[in-house]
Amino acid sequence: MTEQLKEEEVQIIIHHWIRTLNIKLGWIKDFDNIVVNYVSTAFMLDSFCSSSKLISTFTGHTNIVWSIDRSIFDDSQLICSGSGDSTVRVWDIDTNKQIQLFDEHSASVYCVKFSPYHYYNYHQYVICSSSNDETIRFWDIKDNKQLQIFNDHTLGVCGIEFSPFNGGRYLCSGSDDNTICLWDVETSKSLHVFNGHGDTVFCVDISPLQNNNNYNDNKMNNIGVIGGNGYTICSGSRDETIRIWDIETTKQLNVFNGHKECINSVKYGSNELLNAILSGSDDESIRLWDIRSGEQIQVFNGHSGSVMRVEYSPFVIKNSIGNSNVICSGSFDKTIRFWDIRSNKRELHVMKLDERVTCLKFMKLKKKVNNNEKKSNSDSCVNLCYCSAEELIYSISSNAYYKLKIVKLFMMSK
């Protein structure tokens, strides 16, 4: 590997994880833009695709795996998963072994998330799961017990998402009862129910950054949310619409029409894509929307089956007008596809698989080292983890590993 390629790989990893910190931890709004001025984001998607390989397969579920999430607690690297077998499972990435199983749901588990609220406030390792049994449950990994249960929905609960503000204290959920519910994790109370969809709400997301200039994080709105002013929720439904909801006023702000079938996945953008939403649908398309105008910006066609999950990748590509972000989609057509977000031409790369893809997630993982190698917390790599309709979880990694020098990272902002 050339020195230039190594440098490009380090640069894009730095850029991607600074962007993640900006979203998750609320770093100053212009920090990412400052760093971009000093870091060239020229890491080619081809570098990942040409050197990627299957590194792990997690087996144990006995039905379709609907959801995965990743978290690094202390020195442990963990994945959690939710399945049609009604279980939530926890896996150790370093050993590829299942370390915990929660089986108190009585129906399919549709979504799982590690709880930032419990970790940052109580240093508890907790998973939140939503199920077709009409409940949302919280599980303590270390003590192997259920901590909380939310049961205000009247039908199955589909997508869930923690708030990026106030330490993840709030959770939103979409349901077969056609509603979105906003919960206070601290009190276990439902704060508000958003009505407007005409069918099942399969997916939800909360905007990563405030859309106005109100930085009073301690202000409480009229439904009891602290720090949520300026944030919005987006929801995708079987009614073929995407809707935007204002957390402060609880009003519906916009409706996006364009998909011809059920919407399975919605994702807010960040930074330069702050005013964009990405969506995937049973109509086999991926669409990009402008939040401000309510207009469709791009439509990406190429899949021959339902698009189950869309994600913003950590990669960028060079094109005729400069650098462009790369988005990723997983489908029932047994492919994962990469797209130039600025172009609706053919996909950049297609990963052909043996199973239908139900979900996917990019993960920063620590490099596995041999016993005779010196272990360093700064050795890390980017992995693509995906779930299949055939009960398995796979992890794909590039052969290239990236050693991030934290001192240099912070010096770039000066």
Residues covered by each model-derived region:
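Intrinsically disordered, low-complexity acidic/Ser/Thr/Pro-rich linker and tail segments
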Residues: 1-69, 73, 77-80, 205-224, ...
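A structural motif specific to WD40 beta-propellers
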Residues: 53-56, 76, 97-100, 145-148, ...
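WD40/WD-repeat beta-propeller blade N-cap
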Residues: 58-65, 102-109, 116, 150-157, ...
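A conserved positional marker within WD40/Gbeta-like beta-propeller blades
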Residues: 62, 87, 98, 106-108, ...
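WD40-repeat beta-propellers
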Residues: 68, 88-92, 112, 136-140, ...
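Loop/turn segments within WD40 beta-propeller blades
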Residues: 69-76, 95, 113-124, 143, ...
